[in-house]
Amino acid sequence: MMMKGCFGEVGVCVVLLVCCWGQEVTAQPALTYHNHVHVRSFEIDYEHSQFLKDGQPYRYVSGSIHYFRVLAADWPDRLWKLRMAGFNAVQTVIEWATHEPRQGEYLFSGNNDLEEFIKTAQRLGLDVILRIGPYICAERDMGGMPYWLLKLHPDIRLRTSDPAFLRHMDRWLGEVLLPRIRSLLYENGGPVIMVQLENEYGCLVKLCDRHYTKHLRDLTREKLGPRVVLFTTDNPIPDHLMEGKIPGVYATIDFGVGKDPKEMFKMQRLFEPRGPLDNSEYHSGWMDHWGLHHHTVDSKVLAEGLDAILALNASVNMFMFHGGTSFGLTSGSNILPKFRANPTSYDYDAPVSEAGDPTDKYLPIRDVVSKYLPVPQGPIPRPTKKGVYGAVNLTAIASLWEVAARLPTTYHPWPLTFEQLDLSVGLVIYSTRVPFRIPDPARLSLPNVHDRGYVFVGGRDAGMVSREQGMMDVAVRATQGDTITVVVESQGRISAGSHINDFKGLTTNATLNGHVLKGWNMTAVPLTNTSILPDAPWSPRHLPATPGTPSGGLTFYSGVFTVPDEDPHPLNTFLRVNGWSKGVAWVNRFCLGRYWPEVGPQVTLYVPWSILKRGQNELLLLELESAPCPAPLPCAATLQDKHVLDGPTPT
């Protein structure tokens, strides 16, 4: 049991004033009546196997919304839809890489304003459950940890007591994140009731490091105080729970549809004989991967499973309630058992779609929750109107070669990784010369390319290498003195398991007919840095740029579309790139993410209303492989009102 009482640097207790719906909620000094002080508290009642909130039995029904997958302008809308479904809490993970993309540079404003997200939830009457990591998985690049850990320490053992890892983790959590969270804890007047440490750590089984997890526990207790409820989550498998359990931290489980909740909770009871039953990840859908079919879960099955969990008086978090989007190039990848990258969309077949619309799951879920918790009165959320902004004519404005020519080049005898070149995501152009006479054809071997490479010899297209397809060799025709160029794309670092030290680029030496190639010039192309993007010359007399390849690949294309001035505000819309192959899209210099309709299942990209403006807007594509029209004819893309996430796939 957690102790009750006052604490804090100023020695006062705090209490949440009861406010009307939608009103700002702030921390206030506790009021004293006849020498009685009301102290806000949230704790575990082990004797009666329940949570207590201010001394009263409590169970949470929460939904996962990742603030970094939703633009800040839409946080109130998504959280309101969660509350109107009867949920009383929101769960979110906190991504280290979002807030410290470069070592020592911290971002906590705008779309990264974590504290504002938490306060918005509080204003809407939602409690908050935080998952602080430092590893979060969530199908994010490197599981949400920053790439520069690999840059600084190539041999670092992530998620362990490796001193290098602990040093950076301690600074991030102990000096930056946790002090920001403390004032938002429930006992301090905020909405944060629980904090999760790590994520499914037990799935590593024999790789688990108890010194690390105890260190994480102690650091969190030191910075947040002794009374905050800490918890872990693991698969309901004995080995996973045994390895993931941290002494003094409450162990919860996660499972989706098709599982018997009674049997699953028996697993939790093996490690928590007393305390609340808690499924902290009840899956509403599942993740997608490029080239594999789109995952869905039947709404009736999902609702019945939720009902069965709640009937046991368990607490539950629905993962995801609203999935959102991995904007930019932040999506991760997995080994299944071969490499597979996650798409830009994180729709997850959730009750609220990527664009913020209630799906066919919303009302059945709401009906189930209403049996156990009061559902707020008010209008039931409805789908919003979408923009049909039509065809966008796109003209080639620069080749990748032109853009790269303005960027610095690094020379080294051996090929360097993205991390060694201080590049998080994007492209690296590797070039070397053939120093000797070779047979015709010769075999160029690029073992362990991470992840996809476009090969050129003497300026001519010579083929492709692919980690996903296990294609690491190319037969080339070259003469002594020819330049070999390889453009390597990162498709997202592995987000789970023992392979998250996922270096990108040419990660081992390249050979030509068995001879190691030396002397490399390398140009890092940081596609998330808008300052490197080419400007569009809007003069109608401007001639299209020469494409980077004869097929129109490795080329930037730009065009404009109009949002009518008479519209009160822009509308959500979806970018369709029929005929285009693979690349990256920006609207008004905001990076929507990767597109790859050739392999599916994601065909369209979500374009949020808040990045648009009335009048002219710019669409920019970097096509990596082939455009749907021969130069110099203009190509086109379309902005439509339908999202397509279940397109055809090769397998």
Where is each model-derived feature located?
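Carbohydrate-binding surfaces of carbohydrate-active enzymes
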Residues: L166-I181, N188-L197, G202-L204, D209-T213, ...
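Aromatic- and glycine-enriched glycan-recognition loops and surfaces
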Residues: H66-M84, Q103-R123, H211, I438-L444, ...
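Aromatic-lined ligand-binding clefts that engage carbohydrates, nucleic acids, or primary amines
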Residues: D440-F456, I484, F561-N588, Y595-W596, ...
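Short, solvent-exposed turn/loop segments enriched in Gly/Ser/Thr/Pro and often Arg
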Residues: V90-A97, R131-R140, I193-E198, D234-P236, ...
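Extended substrate-binding grooves/exosites of carbohydrate-active enzymes
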Residues: Y33-N35, V39-A73, W80-M84, E105, ...
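Aromatic-lined substrate-binding rim segments of carbohydrate-active enzymes
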Residues: W75-G143, Y147, R217-V228
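Gly/Pro-rich turn-and-neighbor structural signature
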Residues: G189-R274
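Cleavable N-terminal signal peptides of Sec/SRP-targeted secreted and luminal proteins
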Residues: G5-A27
